Amino acid sequence: MVLIGGLAGLVLTVINAATFHPVTAAVPPAFERASVLSGAMAVALLLVSILWTQANPRDPEKVQLEGIQGLQLVASLPNSLKQELGWGSTLLLTATPASTMLLVWGQRVLLKRGVLVSEDYCNGPIVQRAKEKQQTISLVNMALYPGRDEFNYLPSNTPAVVVQPIGEEGVLVIGGWSPRCFSRSDEVWIEGWARKLRTELELLPEVALQGPLAPPESAAES
């Protein structure tokens, strides 16, 4: 609305100046001042509207990820860790723009939740770099990254990805529902949860990682 008002004011100022026909050859000073002032105000409105649009961009539209909603968990994990993963992943998928996620520890997928696909996890160069540097890598717009094929274990139309290392052995890979959807506060929360998980994961015996990755109902039956 501000942009429309600025454009309308500028157009009216130009029309007024073009159609004004003074009785004498000289343009009255009052008219000149009014024209300059109205033109300046119209330009100011245009600038305000542009700055406002940049400071408050429209929220990107939510992408419907291609896959099936699901939850898969390694059956042999301790109950305390299962509860932590259930609570944390639920909060992640409801309180942030996350739509899909994987937890990997020691090259083994322990948890998949959200929109799932059938492709197996593969430790690619971006994930490896996050582990080596122990830094979060946020891919804000997957369409711009030539290495996006590394994440074929996520839905193919995932717009944004956060790679969060968990020590040198683990990683959280989280897919969001639109480009640039993860805020800094989202990333801080993810980092905090990763630190909490690392403490528990480093204490796991090897036997706890040997169970099948399956929906909780199937795991309970087996």
Residue positions per predicted region:
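Alpha-helical transmembrane segments and their helix-membrane boundary motifs
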Residues: 1-58
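Membrane-proximal helical linkers
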Residues: 52-83
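Short amphipathic alpha-helical segments
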Residues: 80-84, 88, 122, 185-189, ...
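Short, hydrophobic-rich beta-strand element in sensory/regulatory alpha-beta domains
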Residues: 89-93, 97-114
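Regulatory sensory and allosteric helical modules in signal-transduction proteins
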Residues: 106-162
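Short hydrophobic/glycine-rich mini-motifs in sensory/regulatory modules
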Residues: 164-173
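Juxtadomain coupling helices with adjacent low-complexity linkers
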Residues: 172-222
